[in-house]
Amino acid sequence: MRSAIILAAAVLTLSAQSELPPGILLLARVKAHTRAELKRLPNCSCLETVHREIKGARERLRPLDVVRLEVLYSDGKEMYAPPGDRRFAAEHPSAFAGGGMIGDGYFALYLSDLTGEGRVSYEYKGEEDVQGRRLARYDFRLPAMMSGQTIHMVEGTGTVGSTGSFWADPATYDIVRLEFHATEIPPFLPISESSHWVEYKRTKLGENEFLLPETASTRMVRLNGEESVNRMGFAQCHLYEAESSISFGMKEEIPGFATTAASDTELKPLQALLEITTRLSKPITLENAVGSLIEATVSGNVPRKGTVLIPDGSLVRGRVKRMEWNQEKGGYYIVGLEFREIDAAGVKYRFFADLQMLDRAPGVGFTLVFDTTQNRQVAGSTEILSLPEVPGVGTFFVRGRKLDLPKGFRMNWKTRPLLP
């Protein structure tokens, strides 16, 4: 009798499954599989390269800069550092880019939101051919009140909902592609559109394979018509161990990557108003992406109360904060350099200083002067461009398409009190 009851239950289960609308059973399996994949995702690190473009309301897209960061996925969170640095920070990646649009959440946040219980409404759209693969497509809607997605801007930070689609492999249940657009945008954020596309791929880490982002892109449009587009790639992914030194061993040559730096908690503060002259240890060119580590040396002893506080030749470490191309008025770059620490005979100091003077070099300066005369027979007028001060970041212009700050390029700095 017991076996008959079990058999009857099995028949009822099969009958119920056969009566489910198309795609329902597959959706349940895709969601369960994705949650299991996120749970088993180990601590790992990838090199993220971001090609950023911008345009005005009536312009074509033009390159802005290239940002390279190491992104560490650890215990459900994403952290960031310049390539080659071990000081991963849990702050938003915009802190490393010095302006412009940049995003996060590609490892787990979006997939976690998408497959959460009771959060999302789905609609099965059938199977489609995508790059030679037969994939099941689902449209979805995620309300802002259930979303973990936020948009960070100068005007503020707000939580948004999303609507979009994802494509899953019906055989492996892997989500292969994700596309979504922001909804319920808070009125204080001056944007009309924010869209994301992510491609996922099985990546071998150690002896196992995991589902990781391979490429992604974002597009944001402001209410005034200005548009920003980012195209991202993730490469050189590997398991991360807290005690190991990070080195990607990149196949392409990417200058400017430096050795491991100390954590901020290990750095001693420097008193304010010290005058320090530095010289670049290596040239800075267009090959140095935003986020790349840079090095310089102190030129001349820095005295303090009759003794040498920082000896000549001490190593100074930092990173490229900005490298933005602007094509107006003949074209120019905005360059921002942020030095963070000085190694003075084994004692590491926090370097927090304002740039006072630049070496003489063609087209390099704190301001740009343009002749705005329309008629050469009439006395001319000029337009002067300057840059806002950013504490701790030396920002300046380089006129023309060529950017080459040579080895030995001199910069004079004055230290300032650490911000509270």
Question: Residue spans of the language-model regions?
Answer:
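Contiguous beta-sheet cores, especially beta-hairpins with glycine/small-residue-rich turns
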Residues: 176, 265-420
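Glycine-rich, flexible loop segments associated with nucleotide phosphate handling
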Residues: 155-165, 334-337, 400
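Short hydrophobic/aromatic-rich motifs at helix boundaries and adjacent loops
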Residues: 5, 96-98, 311-312
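Structured extracytoplasmic
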Residues: 17-163, 170-176, 181-269, 420
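Hydrophobic h-region of N-terminal signal peptides that target proteins for export
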Residues: 5-17
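Generic anion/oxyanion-binding catalytic loop in active/binding sites
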Residues: 5, 162, 397
